[in-house]
Every structure is written in C-alpha cells, then in structure tokens.
C-alpha cells in the first residue's frame, strides 16, 4: 500500500486543510487562468486529485475536468461525491501517457509534485509535457524545502524548472499560510505558473 493510501486510511489529509484555508486565493488564481482564454476553456487535468477537492470546481467553471490519482478507493469516493459531471481516473502521475486520458490545456497540481522524489518529478514533468496542448499552462502549489523533510515535503524552484525543461516559468507567487498551523506555516509555499514553450 502506498504512503498516500495509508494516510487516507488513517484520515491524515493535511493537503485538504490547505485547500479549505486557501480557497479564496486558489479561486483567484484559476480566475486569472480563465481571463487569458476564450470560451470554451478546454480540458483540465487535476493531478493527484484525491477526494476531488478541486476537480468539480474546474468542471463547474466550464472546463472539461479530469481528476487523476493512484489510490483507487479515493478516486471512487471522489466520483461518488461529484455532482458536476467531472471525470475521474485511477492513474499514476509519473506515467501519465499510460492513463490514456487525452491531452489538456490546463494542469492543476496542488501538493502532488512535492511528494515525489527527483526521478518521479522528472517523470511527472515528462508526462505533463506529453499531454499538453499548444499554449497549455500549469498551476502548481508546492511547499518550500525545510529541515523537517520527514514531516513536510517541499521542493525548490530549481526542482520545478528541472522537471519541466520545455516550459516557461511565468510567475512565482507566495501562497498564504494563514490558518495552516505548524509546521506548514513554516514551509514558504509558492504558486508556480508555467506555460508550455512553443516549439522552435
């Protein structure tokens, strides 16, 4: 059983706490994505969707939303709870082409990438790149590196750039920490926005 499967079984879901605490800020960032696009918005992939905290909102906003996670019971729960019409797939973010989910215009990663080792991060980056339509964007939340690696996973900006070499880093914005509590409020979380680099 994977680490995340155990955490879900034990009811340890700190990433959901962040989503609740930062809901307004997350909505504003997705608003920004949508202002730069014409309708229809296109397809969106929620990487490491868990119990579907964000996937339904993407669907309600007008995206054709798909959530992907490698914990089958959690994907089933997300699908059962969803009333938006979004789709859910059991799959591995480090082997996205194998999930056979098609291509996408927007990728959302809230805390998934940071839980992977360097090799897995590179694999996620390669998979996202393979599934990205021209002009696709990626919005990623990741905690910064800390001395508390055993308690709180985190990544550096260099790690993000290394995993997505064919993407332009458009912006890096500090994420709010209010309401998170220790140790997450010491982690310097950042929002990374990337855009697929046009072919030469």
Q: What do these predicted ranges mean?
A:
Residues 111, 115:
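Short catalytic micro-motifs in class I SAM-dependent methyltransferases
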Residues 108:
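A conserved beta-strand element that flanks and buttresses the S-adenosyl-L-methionine
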Residues 1-47, 51-100, 116-131, 136-200:
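Class I (Rossmann-like) S-adenosyl-L-methionine-dependent methyltransferase catalytic domain
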């Amino acid at each position: 059983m994977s680490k995340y499967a155990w955490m879900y079984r034990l009811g340890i879901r700190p990433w959901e706490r962040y989503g609740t605490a930062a809901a307004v800020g997350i909505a504003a960032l997705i608003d920004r994505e949508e202002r730069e696009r014409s309708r229809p918005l296109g397809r969106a992939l929620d990487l490491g969707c868990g119990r579907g905290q964000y996937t339904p909102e993407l669907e309600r906003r007008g995206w054709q939303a798909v959530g992907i996670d490698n914990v089958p019971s959690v994907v089933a729960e997300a699908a059962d709870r969803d009333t938006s019409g979004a789709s859910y797939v059991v799959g591995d973010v480090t082997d996205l082409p194998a999930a056979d989910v098609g291509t996408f215009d927007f990728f959302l990663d809230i805390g998934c990438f940071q839980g992977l080792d360097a090799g897995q991060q590179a694999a996620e980056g390669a998979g996202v790149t393979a599934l990205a339509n021209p002009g696709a964007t990626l919005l990623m939340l990741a905690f910064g590196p800390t001395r508390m690696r055993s308690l709180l996973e985190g990544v550096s900006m260099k790690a993000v750039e290394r995993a997505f070499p064919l993407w332009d880093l458009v912006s890096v914005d500090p994420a709010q920490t209010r309401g998170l509590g220790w140790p997450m409020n010491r982690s310097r979380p950042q929002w990374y926005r990337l855009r697929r680099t046009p072919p030469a």
